[in-house]
Amino acid sequence: CDACRDELLEVKNRRYYYPFTTCTYCGPRWAITNTFPFERAHTNLHSFHMCPVCQEEYTNPLDRRFHSQTNSCPSCGIALSLSDATGKEIAADSQGIFKKIAALIREGYIIGIKNTSGYLLCCDAQNATAIQTLRNRKRRPQKPFAILYASLKQLQGEVGITQAQETELLSPERPIVLISGTGYKGQLVFDALAPGLNQLGVMLPYSGLLELLMKEVQTPVVATSGNIHGSPIISNLEDAQSSLAQVADYFLHHNLDITNAQDDSVVKFTPKFQQKIIYRRSRGYAPNYYGPLPFSTEKIMALGGHLKSTIAFYPNDFLYLSQYLGHLDHYEVFNRFTDTIETFVQLFEAKPEVLLADKHPAYLSTQYGKKLVKQWGVTWHEVQHHKSHFASVMGEHNLFDQNTPVLGVIWDGTGYGDDGHIWGGEFFRYQQKKMERIGHFDYYDWVAGDKMANEPKLSLLSLACEGMDDLLESKFDSRTLNIYQTLLQKNSLKTSSVGRLFDAVASLLGICDTNTYEGEAAILMEQHIETYQLSNCKAYAVISETGTIPTSDIIRNIFAEVGRGVPREAIICNFLFTLATLIFQIARRQRLKHIAFSGGVFQNAILVDMLKEIGKDDYILYFNRNISPNDENIALGQLMYYVNLIKQ
């Protein structure tokens, strides 16, 4: 907070340059909590005994540190140490450490810094060589890095931001905020930080430690999660020295244990309506709760999905939602998932009586849930993936008990459907405690399993129309193309995925054939548009008489546009406009005025703005507010679906 920041930088203050300066208004909470209630004895500060001066502050009702559970100072508090990659200590004096780190960063070294919620990997954001070294070591070839600025003034001196972005950057949550790079006039190595993108993820210091770091460095710094690509953020010294020793040249450690590590949260605002979209809900936002919600006397736990895992728990009259955990394919993430289940059970001193999971039989969350059912002897229910998405936004807006029917538009990359196919372009109708599927994008072939999500050109191959032979031959060698075409002839698994449709369009337009990180093709497509005029847009498809959407028409018409030399930006605008108008065609046909949106596709800021602009006069639109539209909301949706539709 501002008061602690002033003390931190005041030479005569007893907490001068003490990076763990906190009060009742600021400092870590969830990261250091072992059990409830939040009292010092229940946190990792229990072994740090307050000195007489800190104790006086703690017991003085007139002091802002009255009952501050994280209270400490240089005399009784947390110690820093700077070491090299071998573990050899270099410095331990606080002021000297930050000056040394600043010098190392300016020299091009990578520093692993243990912050209040886990390790960050930091380097000079103006040094292309250092950035590329970090990419190589972290095995992160293209995915953008977040940039830490010393102050709002420093950021605004380099690039313009909106009032909504400024408010979020200065909020207590202090997330990474994605901003446009248009008009950027600083010294960042833009192409190295965000390859192919015209946006930056920026944040401001949210701890005393980062405040002191930036005071000494003074120039922007890369600040990315301390992990190897795909694994969870690291939070203890032993793991950092073993797993990150090949990444960082030096380490800044401290001796406060972290129980619940958290990544930085990520948000974006749509350019026209400044609607907030949460991309990753973690530090600052999570865990959070909904309630009181007198749903049930049962204790209910929802295990979420497989990607962007979260857990929801209803142990009393409140629903608690965990932070983003990651993708369960990774061994360390799966361990954190199981640990979080155990943590929730211990914290609330309550074992679930009902377990909920996704219908996909291969999801590790579902498989683990079935083991827990046998172990705990509890009730088991599975909830279809896209119905969970729909239920998440319904629950956030308290729509289950209203009499007005709601159209659910759920678009994402993948989800196991009730018919055994891969859904992802779904329309549902909710009315009087019933949720039914009323439409979807036409099915097309699901090729090569999960590989399809990594290679947009496979989506194009599946949706290819007449005349594309030369284009496909330019993307595949002849042997590979023959193999895939043979697979298509024998394939029985279909998909309605809009996420994969985005991939197909990106490949068709020559934007991306292979994703190096999740959603890369769609993100690169969005970067081609900063503004649009609805009056200049045209649609590439209309809904069929049966209520399905002719996916192939969209691809065929875009291919024709490419042949006519229509600019890429115009085609992308038309594509997004097509998607938006199709939704309102369905709504008119169904005579529905209330529309709820969820699924990862609705992280596209331009699409969200188009929907709000087209629907502003005649429709009431609902989006996920306090949680991401992506699979982070599956656990919340599972629980909302159960208490409102299954239990009822």
Language-model features, listed with the residues they occupy:
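Acidic, glycine-enriched active-site microenvironments
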Residues: 1-648
